[in-house]
């Protein structure tokens, strides 16, 4: 059975499951230097993504479209051969608590002139299916809890077991977009717009909050506003909770929440307000989960899956993992909507086969497209050992290898790599990427040596937790250390067949340092570079490596 999952709205993507094997997931932003978060605009793009994955539209046995905004049913719009069409899809959240995987049936998906029927699962179900079916819990047929916290919903807790998927409770009445909304009121990204948000804002704020300090006076003000506007018994709070499925109402009330905070702590440093808000929500997550576990007793699983856009918050993930509440915590490398096409396909798999694991690799994105840079760039043969020597001499390199990563993190296939031993390298990379000074640069590290350098230094292959840099290494690898002494670590086995692992081994031989700086290889506001020519046209790093060829441009004025 070949299933094709489709995410038509922002973070558009096309995923193909052949039986239980993930063949590919093609995210629109990772094609032709598209804008980040790009939706699927035309059904021809579905055909193109399938072609890149080795399929024709007629090869697919079942199409599944991700659900979207709507209390009962929802509609998504896209262009086709006959013009603009609206497709009926499932709502964002399941209609009934015990029917998480109930499908909406549809027709009229026209691809290359042929109509296909489809079905659609609730958006939240896609998050549940994608995270559980990729987890170690599924492999060992273990029960698990699943925390789903996405932009437009409150954090929702489910239990996954042989009996299926059971909704337990919402943890507290705050939408995931509250994090981005905070940035409209405080900090360097303030914006008077109260009707929308930028999808990249939450990640930037997570970096900026490390410049602030948690303040007890601000905590008290946040608690007061939280009760007055979201969780308490005031008319505004009660009305907000009654209309929780209305995204416009939720957004308006969330902004009122921050407006009152601003009044209560007028004059307080804004980076402290943001840092305190972050910690306030972190404690809410831990304490409400503690309450649910205590209420259920020993029968509730102590395995936790985290999904939804808030699953990209590495500090919350780390706090939950270290809380002592859970035996194990799993976050997939695509917890946000970049994994929704996979989730849609997995929803149909679960409906047919049960809660089974899929066979998958994080390197299942688009293949590197063959291209030739312009005449200003010179290509020469370059083995990984030679590239390691170049890095050891202090040069950053755009590193392109094989198929792209799934999800938003560059994990060594579409990366800019650089030595971490020079403190100025972080500033150099941030300048090349046109980013603010407080933005961190992550390390990619050989996993057997990670505990030597980081606390806890555990095996974290997808850059979804933060670690503290140990004192003895802070001066040896300063470029990967964030302002608060942390690092968003990605580990990789030295025995991995991936070229980036082999490069790290060669670099370690030369320097006795088992890590490099790793940041995404992309132009500002765009997805990963799809080919060498794109990286060279961007031109803000003078060296580009792919398939054992090093392309060099030592004279371009764009290079900072």
UniProtKB/Swiss-Prot annotation:
GO terms for molecular function: transferase activity. Keywords: Nodulation, Transferase. Its EC number is 2.1.3.-. The keyword Transferase applies. It comes from the Bacteria. One of its GO terms (biological process) is biosynthetic process. InterPro entries: Carbam_trans_C (IPR031730), Carbam_trans_C_sf (IPR038152), Carbtransf_dom (IPR003696), NodU/CmcH_Carbamoyltrnsfr (IPR051338). Involved in 6-O-carbamoylation of Nod-factors. Belongs to the NodU/CmcH family. PANTHER family: NODULATION PROTEIN U. This is Nodulation protein U. The gene is nodU.
